[in-house]
Amino acid sequence: MDVPGPVSRRAAAAAATVLLRTARVRRECWFLPTALLCAYGFFASLRPSEPFLTPYLLGPDKNLTEREVFNEIYPVWTYSYLVLLFPVFLATDYLRYKPVVLLQGLSLIVTWFMLLYAQGLLAIQFLEFFYGIATATEIAYYSYIYSVVDLGMYQKVTSYCRSATLVGFTVGSVLGQILVSVAGWSLFSLNVISLTCVSVAFAVAWFLPMPQKSLFFHHIPSTCQRVNGIKVQNGGIVTDTPASNHLPGWEDIESKIPLNMEEPPVEEPEPKPDRLLVLKVLWNDFLMCYSSRPLLCWSVWWALSTCGYFQVVNYTQGLWEKVMPSRYAAIYNGGVEAVSTLLGAVAVFAVGYIKISWSTWGEMTLSLFSLLIAAAVYIMDTVGNIWVCYASYVVFRIIYMLLITIATFQIAANLSMERYALVFGVNTFIALALQTLLTLIVVDASGLGLEITTQFLIYASYFALIAVVFLASGAVSVMKKCRKLEDPQSSSQVTTS
């Protein structure tokens, strides 16, 4: 029964005050989990030995041959990553993130412990399998934070968490280069530092708060309460007028509710997640998302280019070792990785200031820059100068980081967080499937088992093919746009006459 008059207004005001205080408290609670997750990401990425992995495996510590490293060991990471990605994607959501973050930390510890003490081909292959687990579980790191902060904080906490890993990787690369070139430390010592850092990350992960919600399996529908004419929605107060229901973004807010939303005053036991229903919803969302041509276009480029990017990054140390063997000269792998990461970060920052009609020129832009990537990989492969190789690699990484950021923005622009996670997972899975096929044919000893220089020639041709495909698709799109612009003009002229 409604309470009339001033009492009703006082009750509404009191309810509004309580809700605003609750929202303020929730906003303040974002700092601790974000700080802990950033600390975890920083230490997990602080691995000074990583840019020197290939010289370490080929050196006296492991004494492996080039064929064993490139054709029998490195492919194991690709295969394990592919096999684990989809189960980990579902398990991450079902287990509510934190257990999978802990699994990643534990996998990194096992990886670097084995890198220090394991010997022989089979042992190093097992090491690559554990590194595949660590890579596949990385999705938990990037999605955990969305379950413990409000929707309005998503952009800020995303930038913090990604910056933490970026800074960690850069600091690790610079530290490794300084210790090798200036202090004369051994590569074994760098791996000891890496093991220490990932152990610290694992310890930090235990202090992360356990999320109560997740995107799919533990998702709560939108909560809506009314207090005498005031509509309380997702921790905010909205006037119940026709105009407010048609404000820009109203539907978007309804579909993108925060995951850590407060429970209603009357607590009810959370229903057990219907796994089959979740999978059915995922399938319907998949069909709906990829029926959009712009999203399909950007997703195709994402999958194709990420496949090539993984191959180049995974085997570029082998190419450098071929051009300039580390046992005969000083190497600067760590410095190159640090420079390419920093310049890539600058390029990513500049994306926000690029003004272009991506719906018209997006495919042509992808074609042009894919051609530049192909040229960089080709120069890296054919010019037998280590400094040219380093410079080409820096250009390659800058262009890829620039384009993948644009692709991410274009895909995420009109998707809810749930659908963005789905599209990200599907695109990554397709990229890994393509990479597995490419690895099996080109790299694996059971396939062609080609030399590293021949492999990079194929990778350059691969990116050139991507450029041709998007050039043709972009030309068709531009012509269609021009025809649409001409048709209204011609029809208006006919009407005038």
From Swiss-Prot:
It catalyses: thiamine(out) + H(+)(in) = thiamine(in) + H(+)(out); pyridoxine(out) + n H(+)(out) = pyridoxine(in) + n H(+)(in). GO terms for biological process: pyridoxine transport; spermatogenesis; thiamine diphosphate biosynthetic process; thiamine transmembrane transport; thiamine transport; thiamine-containing compound metabolic process; transmembrane transport. The keyword DNA-binding does not apply. Changing S186P: Loss of pyridoxine transport. Changing I109A: Loss of pyridoxine transport. It holds the Pfam family Folate_carrier. Residues 1-28, 92-99, 150-165, 209-285, 355-363, 410-419, 480-497 are cytoplasmic. Glycans are attached at N63, N314. High-affinity transporter for the intake of thiamine. Mediates H(+)-dependent pyridoxine transport. PANTHER family: FOLATE TRANSPORTER, THIAMINE TRANSPORTER 1. Belongs to the reduced folate carrier (RFC) transporter (TC 2.A.48) family. This is Thiamine transporter 1. It comes from Homo sapiens. The lineage of its organism: Eukaryota, Metazoa, Chordata, Craniata, Vertebrata.
